[in-house]
Each structure stands twice: as C-alpha cells, then as structure tokens.
C-alpha cells in the first residue's frame, strides 16, 4: 500500500511530487526523525533512495501534503 501511494504521488498527473514531504525514522537525528521532499526520492525494491541515503519502507513515519497539511500516510 505504501509503495503504491508513493508511486501514485510521483507519477500520476493529478499530483505534484513537490507538494509532499516524507518523514522517516533516523536514529540519532533530532527526535529520531528526518524529512525529505518526495520530489527527491527514487523508489527501489524495498526502500527509497535520497542522495546516497537508503530509507527502508518500514522506517517511513508520515507522508504529508505541504499545501494543506493533510497526512496521507501515518505509521501506526
């Protein structure tokens, strides 16, 4: 489900990837959390790649619409 949502936000013409932010678990960072704009993400098998950082899907905490603050995905 999460991978499908990210693909939809990246590639569907009704969505603009610049409008979304991914928050993910990053141990050692402030509050153990970092964020990356969706537009900078590349999807690989079971993780996302940002620059040289690999983010496993299980570490994604939220996907947020920056325009209206809507949370599209939140890890339970």
UniProtKB/Swiss-Prot annotation:
Name the InterPro entries on file.
Answer: MJ1316, UPF0248
What family does the database annotate?
Belongs to the UPF0248 family.
Xref: NCBIfam families: PRK04257.1
Q: What is this protein called?
A: UPF0248 protein MmarC5_1387
